[in-house]
Amino acid sequence: MSGYDRALSVFSPDGRLLQVEYGQEAVRRGTTAIALRGNECIVIGVERKNVPKLQNVSNFQKIAMVDNHVCLAFAGLNADARILIDKARVEAQNHKLNLADPVSIEYLTRYVAGVQQKYTQSGGVRPFGVSTLIAGFDVGDNTPRVYQTEPAGIYNAWKATAIGRASKAAREYLEKNWKEGLSRDETIHLAVSSLLEVVQTASGNIELAIMDPGKDVEFLHSDKIDTIVKEIQDEKEAEAARKKSGRSAPGVSTTSTIQ
């Protein structure tokens, strides 16, 4: 088995490319990132690791601008993501220079996935240990678009999705609570609440970007995230109190009837 997991382009006897699977494992060990569509907005949220006190926080940004209308978030190896982001930015600029038109979200996703796929077949390299979430609005179109790419070079369109170590729990939460036609505030609220299911309840551990058609991307300040977190916690406490009073109500009713 050791020969197969060292060779990039050699299949194991059961049809697996083990180096690609190791890249997927690097993604599963990465911090969580989510992206979801609203009615006419996109919200991208990522879990941020605790940063040493003397380190510049800007070096740990997990949401990058590829073009004015395209954002990319990732889970996995930071250095690998940096290479993919740089390649995506160059491709977006080349497309604009050659065709005098901004790149479409699907085209850019297909390009990034193509780069990842090439690194599963080429000699002298290894697969990227990164999954990406590519989101934005095509110029002149108000349709929100969210795509996910994987180390194997696969890409898919999503209404809401999650990647990283807690992606399963976050995606299950999104599946239960996401619906068509969410307003901007509802989409932001759902993004934060889904991240709170898997990260520590502090604004410093959450990075949030909101995209609207034809507007600059808005990165929410920690104070705003704090306010949303408090609202969600208050709602949970109120819901727990309602459930508790609902359970105790039958007992009270029975006692009064006997009296």
From Swiss-Prot:
Entry-linked Gene3D superfamilies: Glutamine Phosphoribosylpyrophosphate, subunit 1, domain 1
Cellular component terms per the entry's GO annotation: cytoplasm; cytosol; nuclear periphery; nucleus; proteasome core complex, alpha-subunit complex
GO biological process: proteasome-mediated ubiquitin-dependent protein catabolic process
Keyword field: Cytoplasm, Nucleus, Proteasome
Signal sequence, start to end: none
Residue ranges, annotated region (Disordered): 235-259
UniProt-listed InterPro entries: Ntn_hydrolases_N, Proteasome_alpha, Proteasome_alpha-type, Proteasome_asu_N, Proteasome_sua/b
Disulfide bonds: none
Primary residence: cytoplasm
Keyword Cytoplasm: yes
Subcellular locations according to the entry: Cytoplasm; Nucleus
Keyword Ribosomal protein: no
Known partners and oligomeric status: The 26S proteasome consists of a 20S proteasome core and two 19S regulatory subunits. The 20S proteasome core is composed of 28 subunits that are arranged in four stacked rings, resulting in a barrel-shaped structure. The two end rings are each formed by seven alpha subunits, and the two central rings are each formed by seven beta subunits. The catalytic chamber with the active sites is on the inside of the barrel.
General function of this protein: The proteasome is a multicatalytic proteinase complex which is characterized by its ability to cleave peptides with Arg, Phe, Tyr, Leu, and Glu adjacent to the leaving group at neutral or slightly basic pH. The proteasome has an ATP-dependent proteolytic activity.
Family indicated by similarity: Belongs to the peptidase T1A family.
Protein name: Probable proteasome subunit alpha type-4
The encoding gene: pre6
